[in-house]
Amino acid sequence: MKLIIYVKEGESIDRVLKKWKQKFDKARIIRKLRERQQYIKPSERKRKILTKAKYREFLISKNS
């Protein structure tokens, strides 16, 4: 994946690094790479999403 950052003439290195970091975080490159390291079956992925949702509902009902 490529991150293209346009640098204006006379712009400081710190400013350019800040732009790069923000763009990197928005692109979620690290998360995508970690997900692609191993194959997860669609059924397992759905099960994981459902368990997270149930846990969130449990926390909400517990606090109410």
UniProtKB/Swiss-Prot annotation:
The keyword Ribosomal protein applies. Keywords: Ribonucleoprotein, Ribosomal protein. The keyword Ribonucleoprotein applies. GO terms for molecular function: structural constituent of ribosome. GO terms for biological process: translation. It comes from the Bacteria. GO terms for cellular component: ribonucleoprotein complex; ribosome. It holds the Pfam family Ribosomal_S21. NCBIfam families: S21p. Belongs to the bacterial ribosomal protein bS21 family. This is Small ribosomal subunit protein bS21. It comes from Karelsulcia muelleri (strain GWSS). The lineage of its organism: Bacteria, Pseudomonadati, Bacteroidota, Flavobacteriia, Flavobacteriales.
